[in-house]
Amino acid sequence: MKSRKKVVVGVSGDRISGLPDALICHILSFLPTKEAASTTVLAKRWKPLLAFVPNLNFDDSIYFHPRARRNKYSKSYESFMSFVDSVLALQAKTKTPLKRFHVKCEDVVDQSWVLEWIPKVLKRGVLDIDLHITSSRNYCENSSFYSLPSKIFVSKTLVRLKIQFQDGVHIDVEGGVSLPKLKTLHLDYFKIETSMLNKLLSGCHALEELVLANLMWADSSEDEACHVSVSIPTLKRLNFCRSEDFYEGEFHFYEDYDEENINEGVSLSFDNPNLVYLEYSDVIVDKYKQVSFDSLVEANLRLRKTPDQDETDKVNVTKLLMGIHNVKILYLSDDTLEVLSCCRERIPVFDNLLELTIKTTPYVGWKSLPPLLKSCPSLETLVFEGLHHKYTKRCGDKDGCLCKYENHWGTKKKKNVRTCLSSSLVKVLKILKFGETFEDENEDGLDVDHDDYDDEDAVSCDEVGGVVEEQIEHVKHFLETMPVLKQVILYYNTPKDEDVMKVFKKLEKLPRVASANCNVQISSKNLSLSSTSTKRGTLL
């Protein structure tokens, strides 16, 4: 019988060094570049391998020691920028193709320095660029936006491009635009002329995901009215957001920016037959020339009036709403509710809408909800994000609101008014952030400041307890009115279990509910309670 030799591998055995260089480079490509560079001390053979790593991922949070962050302009701070330079210079000598170039910085000494890296990686045929720069330089009135290098708009290899400079960048497409392979484009905090945006999008024939966030229109030398067209047949996801933080925050120091002319003379067109997701946040433009989303499944609308429009001004967003009428899932912000309450024309019918989420605040009434719900014949799930309500003169009118109160000389008064809820086919009702309070509803008993919104109509609680009691009354009204409810879920915004118990007991005492069989569930971070009520209010 032949003896078998037992092979013992020591704990210190090096199995990685025996791997081919290409495989080691592949392994290193999954590490942050700082850590990949640190591996060169393991063996002489490893030192040149960093030059061939196809994925570069620079993160200053990994590079810096926490104490070094206290001095933004220390040598260690600038050494991060120099480290990126040295790695790019090392790889440039090998002319190795580059797949991914990611940079994430919270502290950058010079953002123009970051932009100088873009042409260098473009020469290497990079597929994926992601620059996430959240630091801010010192603001001054003469500051200007940095410009993206024009070469970035004629890349034959780019598949994914994400640019976020919190200081903002200026996009000026001097020559042509040709991005034949680009599928994902994210631009965040940027300024561009409307004509330049049209030119940019016209060169992205394969685009599937487009994010235009924190967008500012640059001054245009053109005399004719500005028109923006987002028409990309391949597009599947679109995020078009002009955030108030950008044009009302620190960025207004860069130029004299007139908030009253945010969208003056601007018209929009959307023609995207394969789009399935839309997020649109903006003040109302002059005109929506065309809105066509044939395949839309989900939409998130955050419409706002312009600063020079008051509550009584009529607006026309009918064409925009018609363009999304086939959506199945819809989210509406509180500002959008206000816009809908001022529509010149009727809200179109949303035949396919199954789930509707509504954000509420104490500053916006529910005037637009009855006509909206009447326009959703297939609605099954209704979600309130917060259950805040502003009492107006319409409360108490037939289909003037969803509450059971009227505003009687500045006080709430119960009134039995038949609303559209009595014919609602909604089966699931969810209340997110139940018990949430705003600053003017907090425990200090601060009065609501009505100077900014129709103080003649407004009536509000001045205590947290009162706010919760008011929200309980709304839930009771829903239970007593909605005939086919199967489930009501309250996500209570409280750390106290006794708060959940109190609300649960109040809902238990309902003498009757409209639905034959409805499950009521209250959940907080620590506790979840549920019960089933019959039409007579009996708990099962």
UniProtKB/Swiss-Prot annotation:
InterPro entries: F-box-like_dom_sf, F-box_AtFBL13-like, F-box_dom, FBD, FBL60-like, LRR_dom_sf, LRR_FXL15/At3g58940/PEG3-like. Keywords: Leucine-rich repeat, Repeat. The keyword Nucleotidyltransferase does not apply. CDD domains: F-box_AtFBL13-like. This is Putative F-box/LRR-repeat protein At5g41840. Disulfide bonds: none annotated. LRR repeats lie at residues 80-105, 137-165, 189-214, 217-242, 254-282, 329-360, 361-386. Residues 13-61 form the F-box domain. The keyword Membrane does not apply. It comes from the Eukaryota. It holds the Pfam family LRR_At5g56370.
